[in-house]
Amino acid sequence: MAESSSDSDHVRYRDGLSRWATRSFQRGVGSHSTVDVTAKVNTITNTLQDTTRNLRHVDQMLGRYREYSTGQAGAVGQLKEDLEQSINQLRSQRLRRSSGGRSVSVTSLSASDLDGGAVTENLRFAPTSPLKDYDLQGIKRNRFRTGVRFVSETDDMVQLHTFHQSLRDLSSEQVRLGDDLNRELFRRSRSDAETKRVLEELTGKLNEVQKPDVVSDRVERRLQEIEREMRLERELVERRHDQLGLVSLKLQEALKKQEAKADENEDVIKRKLRQSETEKSQLEQELEISRRLLSQSESNRETLLHQVEELRTQLIKAEGDQRGLQHQVPCISKQPLSHQDDQGDDRRFRRGVEREKLSLEKQMADLRVQLNFNSMASELEEVKRCMERKDQEKATLAAQIENLTRDLENREKQQLQMLDQLTEIQNHFETCEANRKRTDLQLSELSQHAEEATKQAEHYLSEFQRSETLREEAEKRREDLKAKAQESIRQWKLKHKKLERSMEKQAETLVQLTEKNNQFIKERDELKSQLCAALQQIENLRKELNDVLSKRALQEEELHCKEKKLNDIESHQAELELEVKNSLDTIHRLENELKRQSKSQSQIKAEKIHLEEEITELKKSQSQDKVKLLEMQESIKDLSAIRADLANKLAEEEKAKKAVFRDLSELTAQVKSKEEETATAITQLKLERDVHQRELEDLSSSLESVKLKHEQNIQELMKHFKKEKSEAESHIRMLKAESLEDKNMAKAHLGQLEKLKSQCEKLTEELTHTENENKKLKLKYQSLKEELDKKEKYISTEEEHLRRMEESRLHLKDQLLCLETEQESILGVIGKEIDEACKTFSRDSLEKLKVLTSGPQLHYDPHRWLAESKTKLQWLCEELKERESRERSMRQQLAACRQELRELTEHKESELLCLFEHIERQEQLLEEFHQEKRGLLEETQRKDEEVETLQDRVNALQMSTRVALDHLESVPEKLSLLEDFKDFRGASSLSEKTDGRYSKYSLHGDSVQQRRDDTKPRIKSFRDDRPLSAGSHAHGLDHSSSCQDHSRFLSSPQFSHSLPVFTKRTIATDPASIEGDTTSLPANGTSPQSKKEEHEIKKYKK
């Protein structure tokens, strides 16, 4: 357009020059000054016409731009309606799925994903989101497949992928909008450059045409001033645009931070879910292990019951043997007095048997106690495992509750931040609306001013055209007058010649001629005066035209400035609309995020309810366990030694609970500090908002000052126009006769006015449309306010729920304190029961119990109390083991005594029948001895196998005792226990010693057989002697053999293996009894064997 206008200017300038040349050629002899003035006037008129055409073109461009802006506004409204419809659909579907038990996340969808396939026509970049259908075929994909389930990790990955794709869509849309803005700015800058170039060309032409004029210099100065003002206004607009860009960047950064926080929260939730799954698997494994241990304990209990039943059967057999011996005692007492020595021996044996019976009864009672102890120990271990599991579950639940509280606090903080950002966005939106309203008002004012200026310009153009017509008519008159004057001069010359020729003839007419001549002179003077007045009028008209042209140029410049302002305002309005779109998008995103957070909070509430139900179930199980514990306490008064381990664990749990309480206090302090930080951040944000508001106020004040200046300039121009109008009216009154042509021009201008009126009506319609849009935006803003109020109510309900949770937590703390007091009471009862058990076991050794029990100061020190309880329990275990060893030794002695009694009865019967039969029986006894050897060999093999099993058990016990040794090494007062355990490690060496003893005793048995072979000739020689002496001698031999068998039994590996490993006291008592028995027997070569055995036992003790 600018190039065409410049070409038309050049052509018209040539036409004007040609016209001026023709006119000057036709006039011929005219004055040069008048010709120059007419040429300038013609050029000015041509330039004015060109400027009017250019203004018309500019008005058409403005109309097109307005239509384009209205089309864009309509498209934006349609997009907003589509977005609202899609969001309503998503909400309705989410409500349906939530009613059906499924959760739907709207966060992964955005406005760009809901446009459909129609957007592909205007795409300038490659597609990025998988949710759009960019195909031209219009194939629609399923939009509502973005349901999120927080159970599986795949759904989380899908949600993250969709969220990432929506972010990419937003970034691509931002890039597209940025490119569109850049194109629009480039187009506007290009149009500004073209207008500048056109103005420069016009100024150059005016300078070339009107170099001597001063008005052109003024116009140039004025144009330069207007350009400076335009530059300043552009700089202000650019600064404003930069500020808005910074605000948008800050908002984008805040959104990115929030998205990063949301990603971090999702990662934390995933980690927690994985940890919970691992903990579940660990709990299942522990349950399987506990089941296996329970099955093992039940099998051990069954084996112990079988052993007890076997012991009972053995006791019943022993009682039956004892009764048989009691029946046999009176029969033996009726025998002759020769058997008194034998009766004394029988009494001694009876006393030993009674003693052994009492010891066996004691051992049976101890075994029963041990059985009960083992059963109760297994049950206590089960209870302990259950308590440990429940404590672990409590710890895990407490950790989960703490994590959930932390997550809730973090999410509350995020919600507060989001609310602050929403308030900031609302404030920014309000300020944008206020600015937009101001700009609308400014646009309306500027349009009114433009209309008035166009009206004034048209009026002045009409006046200028009238003045031009008057000037042309005056020129025509002047030319006519010149022609008339020339013709009159010629006539006067002819008349003068005639008069000179006919002076005489026309003397009478001289007076008339003189009078006519005077009249003509007067007329000539009048014509000259008229010419001077016309010239003056022409000069005045030229000045007026110059002033009008300058004013016209100023008006055109002002119109151009106003058009630029309108363009800038429209661009600013477009930017504000984009910002409004962005703010709406951010509001939708924030709404989606709030919905997602509300869903997550609902899920968290469900999890909390589930956890509370689990806690109630645990409480019920704890109450049941308490009842079971009370029942067990009633039944386990004698066997409460193992509860010390429970006390240790309870103390450790108390420490852990104290640490947890400390962590809770630290967390509360951290929460308070974070709340203070949030308060400071809120104050900073408020200060920044106040600063932004101040800046906006400054900008508004600057705009108002610019408006005031503009109005002042307009008022000055109006005054100047009024003055010129008065002058023009005075001039128009003189030229009313030639107003017919002006009427035709007025009709054309009326048509233009009608066009301008139609344009004004269009502008009013646009204003009404914009007002309707503003009303719609206000309604949307009110709806957003209502939603925010609802969200605030929801947040208040959540705060009440958190308060309830804190109250429940305090109640749980009180319950924990009650449990601690109950644990302390239980520990006191356990200590009392341990002391009673120690008193019962320490009847024979009170000094040991005094050493073990220290002062009452230990109740205040839990560690020392635990150490003392452990030592007491270990002492009780040692006492039990000693008693078990005694029972075993007594059993062996009983078996030996039974065998001896049987052999004595057989020998006595054989002596009564016949000595010969006795010799045969001795031979049979030898054969029996050989069989016994074979049996002993078999028994040795069995014992070897038992030794191997015992070695395996010893290895297991060594592994178990290493742990006990590590614990006992921390207690320096109980080092004697370490020595006992070290002796226990030498059990393998004792087994080797028993094997050596067995070899020795086998050699000793061979020597005994040789002695019996030596006794055979003695028996033959004894046949000649008396039967009584033979019977006594045989009885002595039998007694010696029985003593040897008894010593062999004592030296057997079974007896040596039955010696205890952990005790040294019982071994000291057994040799004394053996010595007593050996002293009662006659010394027939058996004393050195007993001495050897005593010597070996002493070595073993050492």
Swiss-Prot record:
Disordered: annotated span: 326-346, 991-1048, 1070-1102
Residue stretches of biased makeup (Polar residues): 1039-1048, 1076-1089
UniProt xrefs under InterPro entries: CEP128 (IPR026652)
Residue ranges of coiled coil: 215-822, 878-959
GO aspect biological process, one term: motile cilium assembly
Keyword set, alphabetical order: Coiled coil, Cytoplasm, Cytoskeleton, Phosphoprotein
Main localization category: cytoplasm
Highest taxon in the source lineage: Eukaryota
One term under GO cellular component: centriole
Bias type Basic and acidic residues, positions: 1009-1027, 1090-1102
Residue list for modification Phosphoserine: S31, S248, S290
Name the record gives this protein: Centrosomal protein of 128 kDa
Organism from which the protein derives: Mus musculus
Gene responsible for this protein: Cep128
